[in-house]
Structure formats: C-alpha cells, structure tokens
Design a protein with these regions (language model features):
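Short, low-complexity N-terminal intrinsically disordered segments enriched in polar/charged residues
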Residues: 1-27, 31
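Charged, low-complexity, helix/coiled-coil-prone segments
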Residues: 1-7, 40-47, 100-103
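A beta-strand edge to alpha-helix "cap/lid" segment located at domain peripheries
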Residues: 2, 58-120
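Short charge-dense sequence patches
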Residues: 4-15, 48-53, 109-112
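Short, flexible micro-motifs
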Residues: 19, 23, 55, 110
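A solvent-exposed, acidic/Ser-Thr-rich amphipathic alpha-helical stretch
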Residues: 24, 28-77
C-alpha cells in the first residue's frame, strides 16, 4: 500500500476499520459527503443513501459498535478515486465482504458506494 500518491490518508482508513474507530473514519469524510450502501437489506433498486458527515457518522458508530473483526484487505488510490476491500467476521463465524469505491476531494471522501455481501 502506498500512502504517498494521494493526500487521502490510507493509514487512517486502515486504523479506523481495523480498530473499529468510528471517529477516525468519520474524519475521512467531507461535510457534504454521500454514502450509498447496497446489501441484503438495501438492494440495488432501493439502496441505503446517507447524506452528510453526521448521517454517515451515525452509520459508522453503529457498524463499529458491533462485536466483529474488520480487516482492510486492499486499498488502491489513483488521483481523486480510491477503492478498498474489507473482510468482516462475527463471533458466530458469519462473514461479510465489502467492496467500496470512493470519490475524493481535497483528501476527503465526497462519495462512496459500498456493496456488502453476507454469508447465507
């Protein structure tokens, strides 16, 4: 992982995800950011859309508060775009894989689309 190709802080992303630190993650988003989540509860025809750092922060608080492990498997940054894969595991063994695409402005996330797939 190379953290010198962009002003986007990939190490903060890793720390926030792997340490379940919602405050660190929240700081990576622009005040007017938008997050779109597609998963088993929010299909492509009706995705969950969160607007603004406050709404995104509430989502991150809830996610980081869950008893589970998070691993940032890979992150790629190219100019004003980034992508990452995240693997999660609940204590009962249930796994979740998240793939995310990010649009960046001034080193902050302005738009994120995340697709999450859960074990059946």
């Amino acid at each position: 992982m190379n953290t010198t190709t962009s002003t986007f802080d990939t190490e903060a992303l890793r720390r926030g995800i792997e340490e379940r630190d919602a405050a660190t993650l929240r700081a990576l988003y622009a005040p007017d950011a938008e997050m779109t989540v597609v998963d088993r509860n929010a299909p492509p025809s009706q995705p969950r859309v969160l607007r603004g750092r406050t709404a995104i922060g509430e989502f991150l608080d809830e996610t980081c508060g869950r008893d589970m492990t998070h691993l940032l498997e890979r992150v790629v940054v190219s100019g004003d775009t980034a992508a990452f894969t995240q693997a999660c595991r609940y204590p009962d063994g249930t796994r979740v894989l998240c793939l995310a695409m990010l649009d960046l402005r001034d080193g902050l996330i302005v738009s994120q689309t995340a697709v999450q797939e859960w074990d059946a």
